[in-house]
Design a protein with these regions (language model features):
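N-terminal capping/small domains of soluble enzymes
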Residues: 1-182
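Active-site mouth loops of central-metabolism enzymes
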Residues: 30-36, 156-174, 224-236, 283-297, ...
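Alpha-helix-loop-beta-strand connector modules within alpha/beta enzyme cores
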Residues: 49-50, 54, 200-228, 261-283, ...
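Active-site-adjacent beta->alpha loops and helix N-cap segments on the catalytic face
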Residues: 138-149, 194-216, 234-237, 256-274, ...
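Internal metal/ion-chelating core segments
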Residues: 166-230
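Catalytic alpha/beta core domains of metabolic enzymes, predominantly
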Residues: 239-242, 247-373
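Extended, intrinsically disordered, low-complexity segments
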Residues: 384-425
Length: 425
């Protein structure tokens, strides 16, 4: 068998940007750094991410590389850092058998471990129409979530996170749910740290929490959604979802990075799951936070949307975790931008939200949002009912364009919250 020389094979990998076919190619943009010319880094990445390996092999003919190999269509930068853009043959990856899991194993796999690349970050990922059509996306999305919460106006959803994170028994959960729901919020959820410890079994927690919510609704007339955390091994997700729903849950929650794309997709697409899915991003920063290495959070969020997240966490504007405004806006765009038939995912802000910063959060992030507070509700000096009321008072002030300090003059719960619920760091 005659082999094509390396130079000819490498030359075959370059195409002009106008040759990229949106109906045929999956395109990816990477930031790269390394001790080599940009084109050399692009070539090695394209080879590793498609047909090639560390040496030429007999059956990797020129025809194979031309037909199935990754193509380089744009390289920018110099002095060992910049951006490379590659077009992958979508036919290499079946969107349903293998799907996102297989795709990322190739185009966002070994590239992170290559010696020639000191740093690499996947910044953008775009799909042909037929690939997107294979993903059903959220069942509820933004408007469906509002409807499920009984909200008939275009406003953010405000909710609470049960605190302390762990350590409460089911009866106490129910008591806290009742107290919080009395304050008029729309939503409450488990902390990501709890699923079903022996002192607070999931089914008991759901039963007691929903009983507390129902008791509050008898007084307020207001529906409240409760997202119960069912994060578990993938083959047990549907079983746990069924147990939660049978116990009365009107919402589910999962930790996206740890159940994976396939776990979320299987849960969201199952016809037995007729409630929204709240997706926490806990753990995402392990691969998204570095500006130079990993996967951009907007790419990850886009994939979570495709796989069926009805709501997805994006961090908070003035909170306790890392925040970058440009990154956050890029992330929100990934959840809202038109994507064929796929519904919008509702962005969820949490981690340091409180009555005093809700106004700036609404102004920065918009109305099609969910804002959650844990300590910002339960840390209120007068208790969780007052904390929930203060959050709703802050929301109404923000929507009316009234400064929170002014609104506090007419709302005692808000007035009590402002001097005490502040972040020291």
């Amino acid at each position: 068998m005659s082999r094509t020389d390396d130079k000819t094979l490498r030359e075959s990998m370059y195409i002009k940007p106008e040759a990229v076919d949106p109906d045929r190619h999956i395109t990816a943009k990477y930031y790269v750094e390394g001790n080599a010319p940009m084109n050399k880094m692009a070539e090695e990445a394209a080879i590793e991410n498609s047909t090639g390996t560390w040496t030429l092999v007999g059956y990797e003919t020129l025809e194979v590389r031309k037909k199935f190999g990754a193509k380089i269509f744009r390289v920018t930068g110099s002095n060992g850092s910049g951006f490379i853009e590659l077009a992958y043959e979508a036919a290499n990856y079946d969107p349903e058998l293998g799907g996102i899991n297989c795709l990322l194993s190739d185009i966002a796999g070994n590239i992170f471990d290559m010696k020639i690349l000191d740093n690499v970050k996947l910044m953008e990922l775009n799909f042909p129409k037929y690939w997107l059509q294979a993903y059903k996306g959220p069942k509820f999305g933004v408007e469906g979530t509002r409807k499920a919460a009984g909200i008939d106006e275009k406003r953010p959803i405000v909710g609470s996170i049960t605190k302390p994170n762990i350590g409460l028994d089911a009866k106490t959960y129910g008591k806290l749910a009742y107290e919080t729901a009395l304050g008029g919020i729309d939503f409450m959820k488990d902390d990501e740290a709890i699923v079903s410890p022996k002192y607070c079994p999931l089914e008991d927690r759901v039963t007691e929490t929903m009983a507390g919510i129902d008791r509050a609704m008898e007084q307020t007339g207001k529906k409240v959604l409760y997202a119960v955390n069912i994060t578990t091994r993938q083959d047990k997700l549907l079983e746990l979802a069924d147990k939660a729903i049978q116990a009365g849950a009107n919402h589910l929650m999962v930790c996206g990075p740890y159940i994976g794309y396939g776990g979320l997709q299987a849960l969201a697409e199952d016809p037995s799951v007729k409630v929204p899915i709240h997706c926490h991003r806990v753990g995402h920063a392990a691969f998204t936070r570095s500006a130079k290495h990993g996967i951009d959070v907007a790419v990850w969020s886009k994939l979570m949307r495709m796989c069926g997240a009805d709501q997805l966490h994006i961090g908070s504007v003035e909170g306790k975790f890392y925040y970058d405004e440009a990154e956050t806006q890029r992330n929100i765009k990934a959840l809202r931008v038109p994507l064929e038939h796929v519904k919008q995912t509702m962005p969820c802000s949490s981690a340091g939200n409180r009555p005093g910063n809700l106004g700036v959060s609404v102004k920065t992030l918009g109305m099609d949002m969910m804002f959650l507070a844990g300590g910002g509700v339960h840390g209120h000096p007068d208790g969780s009912t007052a904390g929930a009321k203060a959050m709703m008072q802050a929301l109404h002030a923000a929507m009316a364009g009234i400064p929170v300090e002014q609104a506090a003059k007419e709302n005692k719960e808000l007035a009590r919250a402002l001097p005490t619920l502040t972040l020291a760091h």
